[in-house]
Amino acid sequence: MVGIEDKSAKRPIYKLAAPALIDLPNVGSAKAFDLEACVNANPDLVILPMKQKDTAQTLSEMGIATLLVLPESHEQLMEMFTLIGTATNSMEKATALIEYYNTKLTAVVELTKDLTDEQKPVVYIGSTSDILRTAPKEMYQASLITTAGGKNAGDVLEGTSWTDIDNETFLTMNPDVIVIPTDNFAVSSPDYTAEDVLNNATFADVTAVKNGAVYQMPVGFEAWDSPVPSGILGTLWMLHTLHPELYTAEQFAADADEFYFTFYGFHVALDQAA
């Protein structure tokens, strides 16, 4: 690698898995890509999100190979692994990652296959910026919930990006469980906490609030609710959160440790992941 995303030092995964990468030249972010810095790094390949397709076109015209990815579903995530594995001559690792995903997802399907509709809680996942922003049915986060044996509250919404709702809509959704993701860097909760939600008088009659079923995803690793290589851990964490009788905290912690050691080369302490 010759260049890395902006604010990489804030992301725990780099410090845990490959701290030397933090010192590479900063080429900006998905929202503010630094074309000049990228070109100056003299890359053989640039991997960009689909939203940067105009930048990719510019790089291609300059003779720099560019790969665009859009992992907004499980299928697209698997496709991304294959594309990057092929482009970087690392298909053995990509294949191992895909096989790991398929094995774990098969296990999740087996564990949840006998759940009745009544046993599947309505789950509301907030965004990193506001509890009144959630994932519509076409987002990756929605599939994470349904795969883990839940019903995404945001399925009543259309779109492929975080969608704003009002208090009335939230109250009408009346979720059984509320999930709060990490912030964008996975170092803390977002701009609000589980306590903020539980103490919000407007939400007092929401089932999840009444039952104390408001959960913060683990911080200190990665944003597991996102379509990233470790996204499978988001599904497994969700499975434990929604159905601890089917998949225990100890099982999740062991799986998280196995994943990070297998694909990143470091161990995760049991109490860090559970």
Can you name each region flagged by the protein language model?
Residues 1-41, 45-51:
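A short, structured surface patch at a secondary-structure boundary
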Residues 1-4, 46-48, 65-71, 152-154:
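Short hydrophobic/aromatic-enriched beta-strand-loop microsegments
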Residues 5, 141-161, 182, 213-218:
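His/Asp/Glu-enriched short active-site or ligand-binding loop at hydrolase and phosphoryl-transfer sites
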Residues 27-30, 35-48, 64, 166-183:
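Proline-aspartate-enriched helix->loop->beta-strand connector
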Residues 52-61, 182-197:
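A ligand-binding cleft/hinge motif common to bilobed small-molecule-binding domains
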Residues 55-133, 154-156, 161-162, 209-273:
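Extracytoplasmic substrate-binding proteins
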Residues 110, 162-169, 197-204:
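Alpha-helical scaffolding within the catalytic cores
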Residues 134-135, 142-144, 149, 167-173, ...:
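A residue-level marker of the well-folded mature domains of exported/periplasmic proteins
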